[in-house]
């Protein structure tokens, strides 16, 4: 699992965490690394307009690799 290059939208994080039944991030907290690595914010995009909908239907846990890579916003 790679380090996110941007901060996730608060709504997406809440949906993912609630689906997983926890309050902790999906992986260990790399918040400082994320901020240090986010120089332009250009990488913080969803590659599909359905990302938020997918998160609300459980795709964060069903397909975490795709969601982390393609649904970053």
Swiss-Prot record:
Residues cleaved off as propeptide: 18-35
Upper classification of the organism: Eukaryota, Metazoa, Spiralia, Lophotrochozoa, Mollusca
Amino acid composition bias (Basic and acidic residues), ranges on this chain: 27-38
Compartments where found: Secreted
TM regions (residue ranges): none
Post-translational modification remark: Contain 2 disulfide bonds.
Glycosyltransferase keyword on record: no
Lineage: superkingdom: Eukaryota
GO MF entries: toxin activity
Location of region: Disordered: 22-42
Gene Ontology cellular-component terms listed: extracellular region
Chain's role: Probable neurotoxin.
Tissue: Expressed by the venom duct.
Coiled coil spans: none
Protein name (database record): Conotoxin Im14.3
């Amino acid at each position: 699992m790679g380090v996110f290059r941007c901060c996730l939208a608060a709504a997406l994080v809440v949906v993912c965490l609630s689906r997983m039944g926890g309050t902790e991030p999906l992986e260990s907290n790399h918040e400082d690394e994320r901020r240090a690595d986010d120089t332009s914010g250009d990488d913080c995009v969803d590659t599909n307009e359905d990302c938020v909908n997918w998160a609300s239907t459980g795709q964060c846990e069903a397909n975490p690799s795709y969601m982390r890579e393609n649904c970053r916003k």
